[in-house]
Regions:
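Active-site loop-to-helix "anion-binding N-cap" substructures in soluble metabolic enzymes
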Residues: 2-141
């Protein structure tokens, strides 16, 4: 049933998306400077395109606070396939929702290659993210 939900949300979109996954490239000062110099001044029609930035977990609150362009979406780079509990170092989809996020990127090629995440794990994460009300940018290929 969750896969139908994913497909419905995926193929129902008529909008384009421009997403920037910052990976682990910016320091906090660089991230907020980029938001202020490049992201906040962007002019575009949010009915036609979604603009998404994806900072590291620790920078999410500062990026949310720094952005003045309310149309810009802040997404997490990953989430756990576990809910709340004793999962040291994991960030659950519920934590992401609590932080004010609506989107998460899952299945990135680097996580597949370096961390060795497989399709089964990514599907598990996707399912839990959707069940917790997150929208998913699902990377495949």
């Amino acid at each position: 049933m969750w896969s139908r939900t994913l497909l419905r949300h995926t193929f129902a979109r008529n909008k384009r998306m421009i997403a920037g996954n910052w990976k682990s490239n910016f320091t906090l000062a660089e991230a907020t400077a980029f938001i202020n110099s490049t992201i906040n001044p962007l002019k575009y029609n949010p009915n036609n395109v979604d603009v998404v930035v994806s900072p590291v977990f620790l920078h999410i609150p500062a990026v949310l606070a720094a952005k003045t362009n309310n149309s810009v979406i802040v997404a997490a780079q990953n989430c756990s396939n576990y809910g709340l509990g004793a999962y040291t170092g994991e960030v659950s989809p519920k934590h992401l929702k609590d932080a004010g996020l609506e989107w998460v990127i899952l299945g990135h090629s680097e996580r597949r290659t370096i961390i060795r995440e497989n399709d089964e794990l990514i599907v598990s994460k996707t399912k839990l993210a959707i069940e917790n009300g997150l929208r998913v940018i699902y990377c495949f290929g």
